[in-house]
From Swiss-Prot:
The gene is rsmG. S-adenosyl-L-methionine binds at G76, Q81, V127, E128, R141. It holds the Pfam family GidB. Belongs to the methyltransferase superfamily. RNA methyltransferase RsmG family. Keywords: Cytoplasm, Methyltransferase, rRNA processing, S-adenosyl-L-methionine, Transferase. Transmembrane segments: none annotated. It comes from the Bacteria. This is Ribosomal RNA small subunit methyltransferase G. It is an enzyme of class 2 (transferase). GO terms for cellular component: cytosol. HAMAP family: 16SrRNA_methyltr_G (MF_00074). Specifically methylates the N7 position of guanine in position 527 of 16S rRNA. It comes from Neisseria meningitidis serogroup C / serotype 2a (strain ATCC 700532 / DSM 15464 / FAM18). It catalyses: guanosine(527) in 16S rRNA + S-adenosyl-L-methionine = N(7)-methylguanosine(527) in 16S rRNA + S-adenosyl-L-homocysteine. It is found in: Cytoplasm.
């Protein structure tokens, strides 16, 4: 199956409505990952088909969980997941990509320019040291244990905001270790077409 068809079929299977223009931009992002991977060590994946599944479709499972938000922070963004695919599909949301690895943030800056993402800002630094970002939703994909994630990023969450942590298997133990002042709003299993692995999203808020 041609890559454009594979992406379109995956998006349709997920019940998402994403324009042709946005889909083309998502594939341009995959091209950038492939182009700069050796220089910046962005992903262990080399196969384009797997990149579409793991980096695009997996990231797009976040979209239904950021309806109505105006600002989002992607912590430990790495090569830009889930932040860049989200930014492509939601140009109305101001998104900050944060990573401590300067090689990764150099790539992110390049990607933002080449993809024309006017709604994205890239910040280089450790999350605990960042103080000039406030977001309606703070997200991450495979970044840290939930308790550490909320502890390190609580000061970056707007009043009334929430965390959206993208995880693999159901994180029962991690949920049990969350601090008392954090409320688990929802844990939802995510279905990623073509991915033979468990995925969950954990929505958390301050009590």
């Amino acid at each position: 199956m041609e890559r454009k068809e594979r992406l379109r079929a995956g998006i349709a299977a997920m019940g998402l409505d994403i324009s042709e223009t946005a889909q083309d931009r998502l594939l341009a992002y995959v091209d950038l990952l492939k182009k700069w991977n050796k220089t910046y060590n962005l992903t262990a994946l080399r196969d384009e088909e797997k990149m579409i599944v793991h980096h695009l479709l997996d990231s797009l499972t976040l979209l239904p969980h950021i309806e109505g938000v105006q600002t989002m922070l992607d912590v430990g963004s790495g090569g830009g997941q889930p932040g860049i695919p989200a930014a492509v599909c939601r140009p109305d949301v101001q998104i900050t990509l944060l990573d401590a690895n300067t090689k990764k943030t150099a790539f992110l800056q390049q990607a933002v320019i080449e993809l024309g993402l006017d709604n994205v800002r890239v910040v280089s630094g450790r999350v605990e040291a960042v103080s000039d970002v406030r977001a309606d939703v703070v997200t991450s994909r495979a970044f840290a244990e939930l308790a550490d994630f909320v502890s390190w990023t609580g000061h970056l969450l707007k009043d009334g905001g929430y965390w959206a942590a993208m995880k693999g298997v159901y994180p029962q133990g991690e949920i049990g270790r969350l601090p008392q002042d954090v409320c688990v709003e929802k844990v939802q299993r995510l279905d990623v077409p073509g991915l033979d692995a468990e995925r969950h999203i954990v929505i958390l808020s301050k009590r």
